[in-house]
Amino acid sequence: MEDQVILVDEHDNKVGFAGKMAAHQRGALHRAISIFVFDSHSRLMLQRRAAGKYHSGGLWSNTCCSHPRPNEESADAARRRLREEMGVDCELKKAFSFVYRTKFGSGLIEHEFDHVFFGNHDGRPVLNPDEADDWKWVDLTELTVDVRKRPETYSFWLAACLDRVISCRSLNGAGAAAQKIGSTITLMA
């Protein structure tokens, strides 16, 4: 059976469920999670999405991104997917949310109400090869420069929220996970 996603309205209120592919074919707004894990040197753990992913395969992205299951809280989904994709178990804190919509060359449309979580971890990940085929630690300043220079090598959502990630890290101290800021930004492409 196909994975289900939680359909939401513009305020993140649940309005139903849909198959993951159907939601992406229709461009239906659905709930998502994005996780950013930092080490003690304030470097971000990036993953390269597995080539076989249904979209954005082979692109560098944030540590982990996925969708909550029906009736699963976003924070619980974030912890679960971080373990499943990257083999990392760490405390996660909600940082912010944002909404974005973009169309891929394949015709799929990503339209997500994305809940962003921050965590801290110094160990090496254990990659699930179905999800990610490489990883690296990267300095945020270097990442910002590279995303602007070579945007085609990064996932849309990473590039879309990177400035907000940096802002939240600055507001809350580089060594600590961000506290919930409670605001939502909207980005369309």
Curated annotation (Swiss-Prot):
Mn(2+) binds at residues 24, 30, 67, 110, 112. Keywords: Cytoplasm, Isomerase, Isoprene biosynthesis, Magnesium, Manganese, Metal-binding, Plasmid. GO terms for cellular component: cytoplasm. Belongs to the IPP isomerase type 1 family. One of its GO terms (biological process) is isopentenyl diphosphate biosynthetic process. The active site is at residues 65, 112. Its cofactor is Mg(2+); Mn(2+). Residues 28-160 form the Nudix hydrolase domain. Gene3D superfamilies: Nucleoside Triphosphate Pyrophosphohydrolase (3.90.79.10). Its main location: cytoplasm. Catalyzes the 1,3-allylic rearrangement of the homoallylic substrate isopentenyl (IPP) to its highly electrophilic allylic isomer, dimethylallyl diphosphate (DMAPP). The keyword S-adenosyl-L-methionine does not apply. It catalyses: isopentenyl diphosphate = dimethylallyl diphosphate. It is an enzyme of class 5 (isomerase). It is found in: Cytoplasm. The keyword Magnesium applies. InterPro entries: Idi_bact, IsopentenylPP_isomerase_typ1, NUDIX_hydrolase-like_dom_sf, NUDIX_hydrolase_dom. Binds 1 Mg(2+) ion per subunit. The magnesium ion binds only when substrate is bound. This is Isopentenyl-diphosphate Delta-isomerase 2. PROSITE patterns: NUDIX. GO terms for molecular function: isopentenyl-diphosphate delta-isomerase activity; metal ion binding.
